Amino acid sequence: MTVGKSSKMLQHIDYRMRCILQDGRIFIGTFKAFDKHMNLILCDCDEFRKIKPKNSKQAEREEKRVLGLVLLRGENLVSMTVEGPPPKDTGIARVPLAGAAGGPGIGRAAGRGIPAGVPMPQAPAGLAGPVRGVGGPSQQVMTPQGRGTVAAAAAAATASIAGAPTQYPPGRGGPPPPMGRGAPPPGMMGPPPGMRPPMGPPMGIPPGRGTPMGMPPPGMRPPPPGMRGPPPPGMRPPRP
């Protein structure tokens, strides 16, 4: 049901209302809500009913019952009257308004972690990181340079690397000497000055293998003087 703001029912919200039912019972409570069927919700409600005596000589007595929250059916409702103004909300906590003046308290964060007054612990000297600005690249490296400057620096670095002699660590000697064709092996004396070194075996014959031409293999007697040895394989002997 659509209810306008000027409805009388809305004007009596939160009032203390007296509701009389068909059976004569009276409900007095704080009016909170209603609907199109006139079903009512009363808060802090009390019920009053009259009890008839058994004898006619005795007067009627009224009985009170504390009910609390009550839902009244509209079909049993006879009348509604105002019992009193809305009660004052004393002792009920409300959210303070944005423009309200602040109290004497001080707003602080919840107590978690380390208090604000306690100094932060410092790391040991050996485990602390580098100081800001120390240990990074030099200022010349970080300064932006043009294309020509970068190319010249790269060329100079390449030339210095190509022309610089190789540095050997101390205590390990210099580079090995160049091995010539006639250089003697380590531990042997070379030929005197002015003489050519002896020639080694030919490149095709490995040293220590094979025998010179005309020499019999080991274990065989040489032929007698005036006789030739056997012809090499694949050749016919000469005719007499």
UniProtKB/Swiss-Prot annotation:
GO cellular component assignments: catalytic step 2 spliceosome; cytoplasm; cytosol; histone pre-mRNA 3'end processing complex; methylosome; nucleoplasm; nucleus; small nuclear ribonucleoprotein complex
Positions of the UniProt region annotated as Repeat-rich region: 175-236
Residues found modified as Omega-N-methylarginine: 108, 112, 147, 172
Domain Sm positions: 4-86
GO MF: histone pre-mRNA DCP binding; RNA binding; snRNP binding; telomerase RNA binding; U1 snRNP binding; U2 snRNP binding
Post-translational modification: Methylated by PRMT5. Arg-108 and Arg-112 are dimethylated, probably to asymmetric dimethylarginine.
Keywords from the named record: Cytoplasm, Disease variant, Intellectual disability, Methylation, mRNA processing, mRNA splicing, Nucleus, Repeat, Ribonucleoprotein, RNA-binding, Spliceosome
Location(s) in or outside the cell: Cytoplasm, Cytosol; Nucleus
Pfam families in UniProt: LSM
Gene3D superfamilies the record matches: 2.30.30.100
Modification Asymmetric dimethylarginine occurs at: 108, 112
GO biological process terms on file: 7-methylguanosine cap hypermethylation; mRNA splicing, via spliceosome; protein methylation; RNA splicing; spliceosomal snRNP assembly; U2-type prespliceosome assembly
Sequence repeats: 175-181, 191-196, 216-221, 222-228, 230-236
Region span, Disordered: 163-240
Record's disease association: Cerebrocostomandibular syndrome: A syndrome characterized by severe micrognathia, rib defects ranging from a few dorsal rib segments to complete absence of ossification, and intellectual disability.
Function comment: Plays a role in pre-mRNA splicing as a core component of the spliceosomal U1, U2, U4 and U5 small nuclear ribonucleoproteins (snRNPs), the building blocks of the spliceosome. Component of both the pre-catalytic spliceosome B complex and activated spliceosome C complexes. As a component of the minor spliceosome, involved in the splicing of U12-type introns in pre-mRNAs. As part of the U7 snRNP it is involved in histone pre-mRNA 3'-end processing.
UniProt subunit comment: Core component of the spliceosomal U1, U2, U4 and U5 small nuclear ribonucleoproteins (snRNPs), the building blocks of the spliceosome. Most spliceosomal snRNPs contain a common set of Sm proteins, SNRPB, SNRPD1, SNRPD2, SNRPD3, SNRPE, SNRPF and SNRPG that assemble in a heptameric protein ring on the Sm site of the small nuclear RNA to form the core snRNP. Component of the U1 snRNP. The U1 snRNP is composed of the U1 snRNA and the 7 core Sm proteins SNRPB, SNRPD1, SNRPD2, SNRPD3, SNRPE, SNRPF and SNRPG, and at least three U1 snRNP-specific proteins SNRNP70/U1-70K, SNRPA/U1-A and SNRPC/U1-C.
Remarks, miscellaneous: Patients with the autoimmune disease systemic lupus erythematosus (SLE) have autoantibodies directed against some of the individual snRNP polypeptides. The most common autoantigen is called Sm. B/b' bear Sm epitopes.
Similarity comment: Belongs to the snRNP SmB/SmN family.
Name of the protein: Small nuclear ribonucleoprotein-associated proteins B and B'
